[in-house]
């Protein structure tokens, strides 16, 4: 008997605004749910978050409690979560749900995020191409916080620099940094699935594994890889409260003249984060905004 095929799941379908994607995925992952997908096209702001929960483990009251845990995440954006749709389904290939809607995604003037299973469209032949198959790690380049980082890399290319990518997800920021001239990228993520996805995408982009080295962990793991050396640029696209916790250890990674691109924060969270960073001896050079999301460009004083 094929026990995997016999499994049944509650499939959650939840329409969401793009501002909520990152926070909801973070929360669901933190709750131990890893069968997740987001359906959307790059040109369409309408998105549907999908999650699969083992039906034998999730009663109606458990599912109601899950939604109660998710609803507060919409409040900082002045939004309310839509009503969820629950459907009991047989085992299905959940990882393919988002693939059917993902198309080639031009970013800025020079970069193209290309799904691994699609051919390069001729109209984008002059762009730097980053091929991605995120698997179960999120980071397709479509989220505003990711795009802020990608566009910042294009505006100020990291030519010849050594780069650290903290919270790398699918590896998209590291691949873009290399495309724009970085010498080497050291990447880390606390999610094992993200580490696996980044390593697989390194091979997909035909890169030497030493040019983009991926480790499991956080600042300490990157510091160990550096063996007493430092990087010139830190990319950190994670939620603002996490940046605040990690910020005191950024000195372990960055050189005296190093810069950081800190994204994943709401614009209204920027003043508090700026205050925290300045108290630690950092200078905030500028805040770039895209919708309600922001990116802080920081350097040492």
Curated annotation (Swiss-Prot):
Keywords: Cytoplasm, Methyltransferase, S-adenosyl-L-methionine, Transferase. Its main location: cytoplasm. InterPro entries: Ribosomal_L11_MeTrfase_PrmA (IPR050078), Ribosomal_PrmA_MeTrfase (IPR004498), SAM-dependent_MTases_sf (IPR029063). It is an enzyme of class 2 (transferase). S-adenosyl-L-methionine binds at residues 146, 167, 189, 237. One of its GO terms (biological process) is methylation. GO terms for molecular function: protein-lysine N-methyltransferase activity. Pfam families: PrmA. Its EC number is 2.1.1.-. One of its GO terms (cellular component) is cytoplasm. It catalyses: L-lysyl-[protein] + 3 S-adenosyl-L-methionine = N(6),N(6),N(6)-trimethyl-L-lysyl-[protein] + 3 S-adenosyl-L-homocysteine + 3 H(+). It is found in: Cytoplasm. PANTHER family: ELECTRON TRANSFER FLAVOPROTEIN BETA SUBUNIT LYSINE METHYLTRANSFERASE. Belongs to the methyltransferase superfamily. PrmA family. NCBIfam families: prmA. Methylates ribosomal protein L11. HAMAP family: Methyltr_PrmA. This is Ribosomal protein L11 methyltransferase. It comes from Prochlorococcus marinus (strain MIT 9313). The lineage of its organism: Bacteria, Bacillati, Cyanobacteriota, Cyanophyceae, Synechococcales. The gene is prmA.
């Amino acid at each position: 008997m094929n026990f995997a095929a016999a499994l049944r799941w509650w499939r959650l379908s939840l329409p969401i605004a793009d501002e909520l994607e990152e926070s909801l995925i973070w929360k669901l992952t933190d709750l131990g749910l890893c069968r997740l997908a987001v359906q959307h096209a790059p040109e369409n702001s309408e998105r549907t978050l999908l999650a699969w929960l083992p039906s034998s483990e999730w009663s109606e009251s458990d599912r109601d409690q899950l939604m109660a845990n998710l609803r507060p995440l919409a409040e900082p954006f002045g939004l309310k979560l839509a009503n969820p749709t629950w459907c009991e389904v047989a085992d299905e290939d959940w990882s393919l749900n988002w693939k059917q809607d993902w198309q080639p995604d031009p970013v800025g003037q020079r970069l193209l995020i290309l799904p691994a299973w699609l051919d390069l469209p001729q109209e984008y032949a002059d762009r730097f191409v980053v091929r991605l198959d995120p698997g179960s790690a999120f980071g397709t380049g479509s989220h505003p916080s990711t795009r802020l980082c990608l566009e910042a890399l294009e505006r100020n290319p990291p030519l010849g620099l050594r780069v650290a990518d903290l919270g790398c997800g699918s590896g998209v920021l590291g691949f873009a940094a290399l495309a724009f001239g970085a010498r080497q990228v050291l990447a880390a993520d606390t999610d094992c699935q993200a580490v696996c996805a980044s390593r697989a995408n390194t091979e997909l982009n035909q890169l030497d594994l030493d040019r983009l080295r991926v480790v499991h962990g956080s600042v300490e793991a990157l510091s160990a890889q550096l063996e007493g050396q430092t990087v010139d640029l830190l990319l950190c696209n994670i939620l603002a409260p996490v940046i605040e916790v990690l910020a005191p250890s950024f000195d372990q990674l960055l050189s005296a003249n190093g810069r950081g691109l800190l994204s994943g924060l709401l614009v209204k969270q920027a003043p508090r984060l700026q205050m925290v960073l300045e108290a630690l001896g950092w200078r905030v050079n500028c805040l770039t905004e895209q919708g309600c999301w922001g990116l802080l460009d920081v350097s040492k004083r």
